[in-house]
């Protein structure tokens, strides 16, 4: 993940190395490098088995832009938030809206779970997610809600971009004010005995299916950035 940070436009303030560790990348010029003892490195790292390389970065994000977004409505598990961000990046989405009560994007577990995708996507942090969805609707976005009483997801007509997919809270689903902004309401079929899916799993299924058609997919292997050129920037409140 440190290598991903080096390749990004984030501001790198310092590199931390554990004694005896040789990084598998060239050290950037002009960046302070601190070599720490095992004890000190373990104290600054929150992982049980740190790899011995860490980076100090400025909290810098790309303002929301593009035409394919996922919106998180009080998704509280850090692993789910990070996994959804990683999957959105892999599927070819442009950005993520994190509403109130979501896990902190900059917590260590969320950061690790993104596996570097935080450096490639754009983000917004609305205080009122329903208001931002209303703004997106006014700009021509379809707003997709996943809910138990929705229409079968795989029976839908294709939905071209721009669109935003809402992912709800792990226990309570999508809140009523956010759900009210949906232009399309879907449910994933459950053919076995399970009552529901993990939020990140359900989001991943829907994101990949929304991007499966050639006219919707923008994914070009081994190129970066892969983002849409259509600007859609919401004010950060």
Where are these regions (language model features)?
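RNA substrate-binding interface of SAM-dependent RNA methyltransferases
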Residues: 7, 61-150
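Short loop/helix-cap segments at secondary-structure boundaries that form the rim of catalytic
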Residues: 23-30, 62-65, 177-180
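N-terminal positively charged helical leader segments and presequences
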Residues: 1-45, 219-237
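Structured adenosyl-cofactor binding patch, chiefly the S-adenosyl-L-methionine
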Residues: 55, 90, 105-118, 176-219, ...
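Short, polar loop motifs at secondary-structure junctions
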Residues: 1, 18-23, 59, 148-150, ...
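Active-site/ligand-binding-proximal alpha/beta "capping" segment
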Residues: 144-194, 198
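Acidic/glycine-rich phosphate/pyrophosphate-binding loops and surrounding catalytic core
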Residues: 46-64, 102
């Amino acid at each position: 993940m440190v290598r991903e940070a080096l390749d990004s436009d984030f501001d790198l303030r310092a590199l931390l190395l554990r004694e005896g560790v040789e990084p598998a990348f060239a050290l950037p010029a002009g960046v302070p490098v601190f070599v720490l003892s095992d004890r000190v490195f373990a104290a600054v790292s929150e992982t049980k088995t740190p790899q011995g390389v860490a980076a100090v970065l400025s909290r810098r994000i790309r303002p929301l832009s593009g035409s394919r977004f996922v919106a998180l409505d009080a998704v509280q598990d850090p692993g789910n938030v990070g996994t959804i961000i990683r999957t959105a990046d892999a599927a070819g989405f442009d950005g993520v809206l994190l509403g109130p009560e979501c896990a902190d994007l900059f917590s260590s577990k969320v950061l690790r779970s993104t596996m570097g995708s935080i450096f490639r996507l754009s983000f917004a942090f609305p205080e009122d997610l329903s208001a931002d969805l209303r703004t997106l609707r006014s700009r021509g976005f379809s707003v997709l809600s996943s809910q138990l009483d929705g229409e079968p997801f795989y029976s839908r007509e294709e939905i071209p971009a721009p669109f935003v997919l809402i992912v709800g809270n792990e226990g309570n689903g999508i809140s009523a004010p956010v759900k009210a902004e949906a232009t399309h309401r879907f449910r994933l079929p459950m053919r076995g005995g399970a009552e529901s899916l993990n939020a990140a799993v359900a989001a991943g299924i829907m994101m990949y299916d929304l991007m499966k058609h050639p006219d919707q997919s923008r994914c070009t292997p081994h190129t970066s950035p892969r983002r849409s050129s259509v600007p859609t920037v919401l004010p950060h409140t």
